[in-house]
C-alpha cells in the first residue's frame, strides 16, 4: 500500500477525520466523532465503503476519539501505511502564508492566533497534542494547513480597516479571511476547467455552506475576500450575521442592555438564516418554503442571503477591472446543491451580461459539476465540488514524503 495521510479537523466538540492517498486522491477512511463532553458522545465512519458507528462513552472527547480510531477502526495494514498527519487550522494570522511542519514555534504561533479564532484554534491544538500521543512515531510528520494562508497575498488596500493604523501594527487588526484551503482548490479547478495555467486564472469563488465566503482571484492569487478579522464578517451565513453596521453593537449594549457575551452569541449563533427565519439555519427550509405564503420568513431569508451574495460578486467583478473574469465558481454545501440560491444571486447580475441556464443549473447538483450559464452569457458560472481534504493531504505529503 502507498504512503497515506491521516487528516484531522478538530472542532471544540467534534473531530472530523479521513485517510487519503495524496497521489491518487482515493479516500480510504472518513468519519466524524461528535457530541464531545456529552453523554451521547459518538463516532461514525466509513472504511473501504463499509459504514460503522459506536458510542464513545459519556463525556468522551478528542483523546478518546483518536484512541478509538487508532485501536478500533484502523486495520494494522492501514495504520502502518499512515506516513504523516495533516491538520486543518482555521487561523494562522499574518505569520503563516503556507503549510508547515509542526514545531514548538508553530504551536506558539497557533496559540497567538487563537485570539482571532477562540473557538477553533484551541481545539486544533488539542488535536495536534492528541495526535502526538496516539501516533508517537509520527511526531515529526505532523503538518498544519492554514485556512488563512491563501488570502495572505491581499494588498493593504484590501486587508486594512479604516481604523487607527496602530491597531493593525500593534495588535494585528486586519482582514485575514477564511476557507482559504477551499478557495485555493477551486481556483485550480477553475483553471483546469477553462484550460488556463493556475497562475493565470481570474475567478470569483463562492464557498457557501453553514459558513460562507467569497474571494476574488487574479492570476491565481487571492486579492480580496469577504471574511475579515474573524469568520463573522461578510455574507449571510447559517447562524452568523455577516456584514452589519458596527453601531448595532452599541445599540444592543446601551439601549437594550445586552451584555457583550449576549451580543456575541446573538451575532455568531442566533443570526444569519436562523435569525431571518427564526426557525432554522438550514438553507433547505428557506428553499422548500420559498413560495409558501404561510411561511414568509423563508422567502425573506433566501432573498436577503442571495442579495448579499450578489453584492459581493458584483463588487469583486469591479475589483478585477480590466482583467478578464474566467468564471464565477460555486462550491460548498449550499453552493454545490442550491440551484435556487445560484439563480437568485446571478439574476441580480444581468447588467454584466450574465445569463443563467435553468436546465444546466438544475443538473449541476448533488456532486455533479458543470457550467450553469448559457453559451452566450458574458461570463461563465460553474459549480465545482470542493475537496479541502485533498489539499491538506497533498500539502502534507509535499512536506513529509
UniProtKB/Swiss-Prot annotation:
Query: Mind naming one GO cellular-component term on file for this protein?
Result: cytosol
Quaternary assembly: Homodimer.
- State where Mg(2+) binds: 9, 388
What cofactor(s) does the depicted protein rely on?
Mg(2+); Mn(2+)
Name the catalytic site residues.
147
Q: Which SUPFAM superfamilies match?
A: Actin-like ATPase domain (SSF53067)
Q: In which pathway does it act?
A: Metabolic intermediate biosynthesis; acetyl-CoA biosynthesis; acetyl-CoA from acetate: step 1/2
Q: Which family does it belong to?
A: Belongs to the acetokinase family.
**What top-level branch of life does the organism fall under?**
Bacteria
Q: Cofactor binding mode, per the note? A: Mg(2+). Can also accept Mn(2+).
In Swiss-Prot or TrEMBL terms, this protein is called Acetate kinase
Query: Reaction catalysed by this chain?
Result: acetate + ATP = acetyl phosphate + ADP
Q: Which InterPro entries match?
A: Ac/propionate_kinase (IPR004372), Aliphatic_acid_kin_short-chain (IPR000890), Aliphatic_acid_kinase_CS (IPR023865), ATPase_NBD (IPR043129)
Please tell me where ATP binds in this chain.
Answer: 16, 207-211, 282-284, 333-337
Record has Protein transport as a keyword: no
A Gene Ontology biological process term: acetyl-CoA biosynthetic process
Keyword annotations from UniProtKB, A to Z:
ATP-binding, Cytoplasm, Kinase, Magnesium, Metal-binding, Nucleotide-binding, Transferase
Catalytic class of the enzyme: transferase
Q: Which residues bind substrate?
A: 88
Pfam name, any one: Acetate_kinase
Q: Give the molecular function GO annotations.
A: acetate kinase activity; ATP binding; magnesium ion binding
Its EC number is 2.7.2.1
User: Where in the cell is the protein located?
Assistant: Cytoplasm
Q: List, alphabetically, the CDD domains matched.
A: ASKHA_NBD_AcK_PK
**Residues the record marks as site: Transition state stabilizer:** 179, 240
Function field: Catalyzes the formation of acetyl phosphate from acetate and ATP. Can also catalyze the reverse reaction.
